[in-house]
């Protein structure tokens, strides 16, 4: 606790890094949402599906009906533009977080690490005075301009970025990644037909080189970014590394998010120099004196947030078994591109009285993304089983020109899964009635044991 007390959270520092970070995050959210809309993903992922896989405790978050689902995306566009401009920031920052997080909570089959990262960043933006310079709020005198802000308002974002990198590196210290170069062997092989680098990428040693370098990079890049002496070289490495991963791996916009976000590690002078290139009519600035009671409250909240962010990636250690198999504590733990998992899931609805059963065609109810994700993720399998039970309870079916009514159906599935290039293994035995297994945080002892060979 003595070390914590010595941390000077409230030392004043230039607001410039916070201003640029505000603009960068707003731009990412704006462009990312436009990309999402132009690709037609709103319709494919949030309008067409018949069911959604909500997060435990957030099942009450439901999609809007039909084309109303465009509304939260429009709100993101508006609020992200306002965040960029620093306009009505007190309202636009919370709106950006709420509208984006609402979308992310709808369906875990769309979970991506950088979406989770952006939810955290937009949440933190609510509590920092990122609009107190270079903003329309200042221009229209809605707020008093500030040249400086407390150190924690910038440090909290550096911490969050550090968490992403360091835990991503720690997660790579495992057998599949370092000793088997998986799943990189699989993904790099997909580029073997490239005219320039194809013959190189199919070489096994290249996959091992990428695996080991990726582990070392993630674990230590933050420390080089924090040092003024090595920062420029480290950032060049950030750009090259993330460009290569974007080019070779199915990783979405994550590399671009990290490239622009890590600019916050640069010195205040660096950011001030950027802002100085733009004309800005400065007004008289103020420095706010934070009362001791407020300091204690802020310090407590910061420490609580830090501890929470340290616990979440480590919660998997509370469970037994292979993490890639049971996925207990896998999400929100910054395990970036560590797993290639494929599954084949055949579901059956069985009448409890007649024992007659029918095989389900999953594509009739699920999108391609949902089916792919569900077939390997235990919690989603249970949710799908509950959906099928509700769907077929007391329903009437016509089979071979005969009419049957299903009473109190049980849901069974025969599921085989392959992890990181291994042969497909039995994941869930057909004998289980999946509709009777509660969807909780309890250990998933109903899964078949994992053979790591």
Each language-model region and where it sits:
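Alpha-helical membrane-anchoring segments
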Residues: 1-453
